[in-house]
């Protein structure tokens, strides 16, 4: 927002509020669940502390679960969400919000996914093999982290979901670049007015 303010000659708070309004408009409608073959995994954002490895309980890290349609040779649509922990309840949020019950789902062997098999009949777990069995998913995780660092530099736990919504709004419309701006403007017009106090 500092860069936006300097470039367009407005106050930093004005630029910040406008950016947040844009991100609000980019939020998923949850009306178009992922279908066919879907891969799911988790990752962390934050500074690792000494002695912390794997799925740690560190307060220094932000935990995210990601789901991605897998199409032959390329990725389809995707979604992600900040989660509290790696429990079945937390992981299940992205399934409920963004994955079709008929999808063919693949995850790694983490035990938190096992209870979800009861609700999703086409569910497979296989070893990650250090990411080798989920290459496309890990590419998208790296792409998101690079985008977050390169474009926004910093975010906190309270705003990370908004950056995630922004990223996947763009990602899911890569094939519709000519209409993405018009789509976004229409969303912003239809939204109820947003004030600084309402999103502070």
Residues covered by each model-derived region:
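Residue-level recognition of single "structural anchor" positions
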Residues: 1-200
């Amino acid at each position: 927002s500092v860069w936006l303010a300097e470039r367009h000659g407005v106050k930093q708070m004005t630029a910040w509020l406008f950016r947040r309004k844009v991100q609000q408009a980019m939020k998923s409608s949850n009306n178009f669940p992922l279908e066919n073959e879907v891969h799911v995994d988790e990752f962390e954002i934050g500074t690792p502390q000494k002695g912390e490895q794997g799925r740690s309980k560190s307060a220094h890290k932000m935990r995210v679960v990601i789901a991605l349609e897998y199409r032959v040779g390329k990725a389809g649509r995707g979604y992600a969400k900040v989660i509290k922990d790696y429990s079945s309840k937390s992981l299940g949020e992205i399934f409920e919000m963004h994955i079709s019950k008929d999808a063919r789902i693949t995850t790694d062997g983490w035990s938190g996914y096992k209870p979800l098999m009861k609700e999703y009949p086409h569910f497979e777990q296989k070893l990650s093999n250090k990411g080798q069995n989920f290459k496309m998913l890990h590419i998208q995780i790296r792409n998101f982290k690079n985008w977050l660092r390169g474009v926004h530099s910093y975010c906190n736990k309270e705003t990370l979901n908004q950056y995630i919504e922004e990223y996947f709004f763009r990602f899911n419309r890569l094939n519709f670049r000519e209409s993405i701006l018009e789509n976004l403007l229409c969303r912003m017009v239809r939204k109820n007015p947003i004030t600084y106090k309402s999103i502070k």
